[in-house]
Amino acid sequence: MHLADFLAGSVGGAFGVAVGYPLDTVKVRLQTQTGYSGFWQCVRKTCRNEGLQGFYRGMSMPISTVSISSSLVFGTYRNILQFLHQLQHRSAGEPHHKAHIFLAGFTGGVTQVLVMAPADIVKVRLQCQTEPVQHISQESSSKYRGPVQCLLRIARDEGLLGLYKGSAALALRDGPSFATYFLTYNTICEILTTENQRPGWPVVLLAGGVSGMCGWAVGTPMDVIKSRLQVDGVSGRRYRGFLHCITHSVRTEGSGVLFRGLTVNCIRAFPVNMSVFAMYEAVVRLLR
């Protein structure tokens, strides 16, 4: 078992959250709320009404849990890939089959949903909870006062299954997204690296950034549905389930709604995943 990949994925994931969280908040608000006309208007309105802290709502929960989920993604990916490689009796020096990379990435993405779902719903609900900066105090009338209270409130009001609301969409987002993510990263590194050599740092940074953008291009439609299901019920219920959320959203807002936040996702994805893979490769090379 490749334990180094679990640790490296954990470090890389936590670092990536810290880099990309402000843009993630903007993305979630664009996907779930109708009061914003576009990216820059959302940024200006958030900054004006809530201050810089408005971009970091709910960050403590994902920064602590993404390290676990990212560890699962990278660790599962590497070990499944190695298993498939050995299953076909391929030698250690042979390049991995593209189908194996895709399948291993898909498995890694789906595996981390059990850990990711509760933290993600807390993150999304806190990000969507807007409050003027001058009113932020212990006497705040906000429904959720912080990550832990939000987690407990959801479990109390909606049951433990409420913490997994939108998890089907999350799995359908992360499976194909991580499959594309790892396949793109490996393909770029393979093209730009001399055979039997480790990719240089410029290649790692480029491949990491591009793979993140490609992964989000694939995952954004399910990301929109996931976010809408997660905030549904906070102030009235609109959707009866996963399929109804898709059909209702497309019917009332057009098919373009499924790509709402795509630009923000791609802008955020490049520096975030450049950082993730840089930290991942650094830790793996240190431990091996």
Curated annotation (Swiss-Prot):
Solcar repeats lie at residues 1-83, 99-191, 199-286. The gene is slc25a47b. GO terms for molecular function: transmembrane transporter activity. Belongs to the mitochondrial carrier (TC 2.A.29) family. It comes from Danio rerio (Zebrafish). PANTHER family: MITOCHONDRIAL BASIC AMINO ACIDS TRANSPORTER-RELATED (PTHR45624), SOLUTE CARRIER FAMILY 25 MEMBER 47 (PTHR45624:SF3). It is a multi-pass membrane protein. This is Solute carrier family 25 member 47-B. GO terms for cellular component: mitochondrial inner membrane; mitochondrion.
